[in-house]
Amino acid sequence: MPTFYTCTRVDASPGSTVGACSKEDSYKTIAKAINRVHKEVPEVVTVIENMANAKSNLVGTTFYDLKEIIALVEDKNRVRICLDTCHLFAAGYDIRTRDTYRETMRKFDEEVGNGYLAGVHLNDSKAELGGCKDLHENIGL
C-alpha cells in the first residue's frame, strides 16, 4: 500500500454490494479496509462520503449504514463523514428548507453523531427528492 506522505485525510465512498453479499457483510468489509489503512498509514483519517441511491445495492446511502460502518472501525477517532448534499437529497433526506435541513441534521446527530461530521460536499441536484439519482447540479440552477 502506498504511503500518503502529505495526506492526512482520505475520502472514500463505501461502494456497492453488487448483489454479492448482504449490507451487513459489506459493513464488515468496508470497516476491515479502513482498519487496514489506519494500521498502515498511522496519520490518516478516513472520511466516508454518503452515497445517493437508497433503493439499490449501494452502501452508505442511509445514516444507519454510516453508523454501522463506524461501529466496526477500531479507531473511531480516525473516521469521519462527509455529507454530499446531492446524495442526501437523492436518498430522500429533505434539505430544501431551513426546517427540513435542521430535521435531517438532527437525524444525523441522533443516528451517527455530529462529532463525526468532517465536511459537506455542497451542491444541488437535478433529480427529485428521493429519486435515487446521483445527478449533481450547480447550486441554485
Which residue ranges define each predicted feature?
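Active-site acidic/histidine proton-transfer and metal-coordination neighborhood
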Residues: M1-R80
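Short helix-capping and hinge/turn segments at secondary-structure transitions, especially at repeat
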Residues: K39-P42, E68-R78, H87, A91-R98, ...
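Conserved, mostly hydrophobic/aromatic
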Residues: T46, D84, V120
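Anionic group-transfer/hydrolysis microenvironments
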Residues: M51, C82, C86, N123
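Gly/Pro-rich active-site loop or hairpin
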Residues: N57-F63, F89-L141
